[in-house]
Amino acid sequence: MPHSVSAFQAAYIGIEVLIALVSVPGNVLVIWAVKVNQALRDATFCFIASLAVADVAVGALVIPLAILINIGPQTYFHTCLMVACPVLILTQSSILALLAIAVDRYLRVKIPLRYKTVVTPRRAAVAIAGCWILSLVVGLTPMFGWNNLSKIEMAWAANGSVGEPVIKCEFEKVISMEYMVYFNFFVWVLPPLLLMVLIYLEVFYLIRKQLSKKVSASSGDPQKYYGKELKIAKSLALILFLFALSWLPLHILNCITLFCPTCHKPTILTYIAIFLTHGNSAMNPIVYAFRIQKFRVTFLKIWNDHFRCQPEPPIDEDLPEEKVDD
């Protein structure tokens, strides 16, 4: 280690480790539930499992690499670049998985009768593979030349050094801010966010429309319908809020770095923004799994079978097709 870890860095590392310790078990539990319960094998839960795989990797790989970059070891330029790229790949995979889930929820509401014929297991698998392939393309783009090597080489040569530059490995030293803002943010983060807003607004509209039809054709208590509508709306608003809260701050800071290089960015703001992006992986099991009845039942069985040594009866795979708890 080139230098001792400061108290501030130690606190950062401690928080990152805590996030990883929450993220990895939570998302492993989601994957485990899909594996053991046949009722969780349809397209919706496959998308959620794909998201969980990405989030496990965030906790098990991205966070340790982020800690390594924060310490700033002396490495060759391309070695540092290889350390930085998995962060881009896996965070992008999480974003695309969230978008796939949003599209899947829209199709469930828009074409409920034809949903199973349109969203087949084969098509769902193709969509999942497509998300990962796109994530690899986006995340590995810096390896193919869109990076800061030319700037580093100029400074390296000016000092009379030869060979591949050896640098203190830091994310912003190797990753181009033009790439992060113009390509990553403006193409692969902001548009999916806006698209999800539109999708969930349409989902809300369609649900409200259907509930209105039911209310107008029913002599029952309309409060029941409005209550369910409100709960669904709150769930969708929570999804959007957590996504925006987690990803926008760091990208806004990147925009400030690019467009106002002389502007001062408090270090604590950068750390908070990083915590939010990584913390989103720990939030996802709660948002996408713990509000689904089939997952809760499976989680309870896993807990009792493997941790309390009190086997539960077999899971009833004919649970109602309820997606969000009433």
Swiss-Prot record:
The chain crosses the membrane at residues 11-33, 47-69, 81-102, 124-146, 177-201, 236-259, 268-292. It is a multi-pass membrane protein. A lipid is attached at residue 309 (S-palmitoyl cysteine). PROSITE patterns: G_PROTEIN_RECEP_F1_1, G_PROTEIN_RECEP_F1_2. One of its GO terms (molecular function) is G protein-coupled adenosine receptor activity. Residues 34-46, 103-123, 202-235, 293-326 are cytoplasmic. The keyword Cytoplasm does not apply. Disulfide bonds join 80-169. SUPFAM superfamilies: Family A G protein-coupled receptor-like. The keyword Repressor does not apply. InterPro entries: Adeno_A1_rcpt, Adenosn_rcpt, GPCR_Rhodpsn, GPCR_Rhodpsn_7TM. It is found in: Cell membrane. GO terms for cellular component: cilium; dendritic spine; plasma membrane. Glycans are attached at residue 159. GO terms for biological process: excitatory postsynaptic potential; leukocyte migration; long-term synaptic depression; mucus secretion; negative regulation of inflammatory response; negative regulation of leukocyte migration; negative regulation of long-term synaptic depression; negative regulation of mucus secretion. Residues 1-10, 70-80, 147-176, 260-267 are extracellular. It holds the Pfam family 7tm_1. Its main location: membrane. Keywords: Cell membrane, Disulfide bond, G-protein coupled receptor, Glycoprotein, Lipoprotein, Membrane, Palmitate, Receptor, Transducer, Transmembrane, Transmembrane helix. Receptor for adenosine. The activity of this receptor is mediated by G proteins which inhibit adenylyl cyclase. PANTHER family: ADENOSINE RECEPTOR A1 (PTHR24246:SF1), OLFACTORY RECEPTOR AND ADENOSINE RECEPTOR (PTHR24246). Belongs to the G-protein coupled receptor 1 family. This is Adenosine receptor A1. It comes from Cavia porcellus (Guinea pig).
